[in-house]
């Protein structure tokens, strides 16, 4: 490339050329591979999606969970991954459980779950009214994870396909964590990742206001009950509300009346205004 550009007017050896490229940062970094964090081909028991039309109206009614990867750079060219498990309260937007792990083993999501369970430690199993929603990854379908949820009276909900929108709120907190709270940070080991995540979670829960909870912080929203004014509403919630309003029958709507002449036995009501 050098010889073609300068036509050999300035002779340069291979090693000298490599030194110049290194000095001025001209090396092309290879595209980073992205690890797959969800394996839904495990053959373990899975559960139906319970939250398709569900909007929580109090804290600890719906937790959403997911796993994302974090990059660790050992030097300028070599990297590895660690994995962040997060559990978010869907009502207050509060991160209630998290754990950074070296592998995708279920032990790390379980640690995040155990952290979240401290919130309901004083609530009897009979009084728990909570849904845990996740993808169908082997970590969440593992026997131990499922057993812990059942032990605490928590209903289990899972996505029914590969569409990220089925777990959009969890996907969104992953994006916020990586591309906002930890943006521009470089990590050399898992301890640095853990410390940074701990600081980011504290800031997110206690200082960062959210338009989706009336510009409160998640810690403040966690003290509320009932509908919170939203200055920003997710597409999922808009869709649910539209479906619910579509299904509402007006008070003055006339019921279908029996009609012996039709196979169905029903006929549409007569609109009095047209008589």
For the regions a protein language model found, what residue spans apply to each?
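Mobile genetic element proteins and their domesticated derivatives, centered on retroelements
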Residues: 1, 17, 21, 51, ...
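Acidic/histidine-rich, metal-coordinating catalytic segments
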Residues: 124-142, 160-164, 214-219
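Basic, flexible linker segments flanking DNA-binding modules
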Residues: 1-59, 163, 217-228
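Anionic group-transfer/hydrolysis microenvironments
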Residues: 68, 91, 99, 137, ...
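C-terminal domain-tail junction helix/linker
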Residues: 143, 150-154, 176-275
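RNase H-like polynucleotidyl transferase catalytic core
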Residues: 30-36, 132-136, 150-169, 185-190
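An active-site-proximal beta-strand-loop segment
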Residues: 52, 56-96
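Active-site beta-loop-alpha junctions of metal-dependent nucleic acid enzymes
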Residues: 80, 98-124, 141
